[in-house]
Amino acid sequence: SEPRLFVRHKFSKQKSKAKLVRNLEWALDIDKVTEAIVEQGRCAISGRPFVYKTGSIDAPSIDRIDSERGYTPDNIMFVGAHINIMKGRLDLETFVNLCKDVAKFRSNEFG
């Protein structure tokens, strides 16, 4: 299906970048990752549904839980592309706490 093709294409490129550019371990099976992402259907952090379109802020992305480690089954979660960019190298607890601070500080502006 279209979501599966999108995910397979995107992560074959990410695998090459991880290995060649970043010299990171890649111990993921693309078929298993693809099925897991499509089954999950939404960002593990924000809960927003995945959008299977290049350039979408909600396109699925593989986040490394521990940014010092590679792409292994015990070190990944599936998140939206912009959540992954925003989180960067932060651990999940720090990222969520920062988001809470921003939401609290800006709550008067956006109701």
Protein language model regions, located:
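Short, non-ligating residues that shape and space the ligands of small metal-coordination modules
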Residues: 52-53, 86-89
